[in-house]
Structures are given as C-alpha cells and as structure tokens.
C-alpha cells in the first residue's frame, strides 16, 4: 500500500479487524493516505504502546523504500518527541523491519554517538543490539563509545547495560578485545551494582569464557546474541 499510513480519528470503542479499522481505546486507526507531514504531526504528540506497535507494523510492511526513508529521516528531527517516537517505533521492529534497517546501521551508530538525549540513546542502542555484527564491519569509534559508557558514572544503568552487551558483540571476533572487555568488567568487582547491570555483567563474562573456549578449540565463535537473551 503506497503512500499510506494510519489516519487517526474518534469512533468510540468500535470492534475492528486487522483488514480494516483497529481501535486503541476511543481512537481508531485505519489505513489511508498519510503524507510525511501528517506522520510528523502525529509523532510530535504523545503516543502509546499499542500505537507504537501499529506504526511499526505499517513502517515495516506498507512503506515503500521512499516512504521508509522519509520515516527514518524523522529520527533526526529537531523536535525531541518526534525523534524519540521514531526510535521507539523502530525498537519494536521484527525481523522484517530490522532487515530494512541493516543498511542504515552505521547511521544509527553515528546518531547514538551524537545525541545528548538519554532516552533516544537508550532506544538506539537497543535497536543496534538487535542488528547482526560482522567481523569486517566493526568500527573502532563505536566500540570505544560503548566502552566509555560502561565506565561512565554519568550514564544511566540501561545505557551501561546495553553498552556491555554491544561491546561483547563487537569484541567476540578478537581475543585481545575480549581480554580488554573482561578486564573492564572485572574492574567493577566489589562495587555495588544494580540487578540489571549485575545481570548484564554476569552474562557477558560467561559469554566471554565460552567464546574463549571456542577460540582455543580453533572454532569460530558461536556464542552470539541468543545466549544473552
């Protein structure tokens, strides 16, 4: 469905199906023409979880390449809420949506390193974590950025935890980088950690140990993201 998105209007609590209208409380979404300016005018407002899932579904399956590109560009919008909402929507993408984002992964990394918005950064890191990492595309600036987040006392716990996982995804190809990451995580020994941060640290230390065994057996590292889920 080209040049389409969701049009929002009031229609009580009508029951709707997936092929027609779909309600979110008293609001009903229906597929119809929705130009970029209309999309932005909706995303500048507060949206809710169910709306986010609907927007994600449309962006993944109904947008052509041009429309998807226009949607992605809103990630850079000067209005904080617009940019945050776009990142929130993309964080709900399934495999189809993540594949559409793969060619833009470096752009998302660059924006993560640029933004000073903690909410947006957390969402971007979550998006990046769900992307595949290849040995030949590991970028030193982003890896350094993740390491800095781990050791920064100013970063929120969620960002530190995501950075731990992302650091492993990049270091897993290189024994010397795994050693550096392990040392960084052990530098927290004896320090009080939140449950989330402690869990991330434990899982990645276990992943490092498993990956090192694989390398020692001259096998390719097989301990990928699924072990961290």
Give the label of every model feature segment.
Residues 5-6, 42:
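Generic early N-terminus positional signal peaking at residue ~5-7
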Residues 25, 35:
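Short coil/turn motifs at helix boundaries and re-entrant loops, enriched in small/polar
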Residues 30-33:
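Cysteine-centered motifs
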Residues 37-229:
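Alpha-helical scaffold domains
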């Amino acid at each position: 469905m080209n040049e389409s998105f969701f049009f929002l209007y009031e229609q009580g609590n009508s029951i709707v199906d997936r092929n027609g209208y779909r309600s979110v409380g008293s609001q009903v979404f229906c597929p119809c023409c929705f130009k970029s300016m209309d999309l932005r005018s909706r995303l500048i407002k507060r949206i809710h979880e169910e709306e986010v899932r609907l927007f994600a579904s449309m962006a993944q399956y109904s947008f052509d390449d041009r429309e998807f590109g226009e949607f992605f560009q809103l990630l850079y919008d000067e209005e904080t809420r617009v940019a945050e909402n776009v990142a929130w929507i993309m964080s709900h993408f399934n495999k189809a949506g993540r594949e559409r984002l793969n060619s833009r992964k470096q752009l998302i990394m660059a924006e993560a390193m640029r933004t000073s918005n903690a909410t947006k950064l957390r969402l971007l890191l979550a998006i990046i974590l769900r992307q595949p990492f290849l040995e030949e595309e590991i970028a030193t600036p982003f890896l350094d950025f993740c390491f800095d987040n781990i050791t920064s006392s100013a970063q929120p716990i969620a960002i530190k935890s995501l950075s731990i996982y992302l650091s492993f995804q990049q270091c897993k190809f290189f024994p010397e980088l795994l050693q550096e990451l392990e040392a960084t995580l052990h530098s927290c020994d004896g320090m009080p950690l939140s449950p989330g941060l402690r869990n991330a640290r434990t899982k990645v230390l276990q992943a490092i140990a498993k990956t090192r065994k694989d390398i020692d057996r001259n096998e390719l590292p097989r301990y990928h993201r699924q072990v961290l889920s």
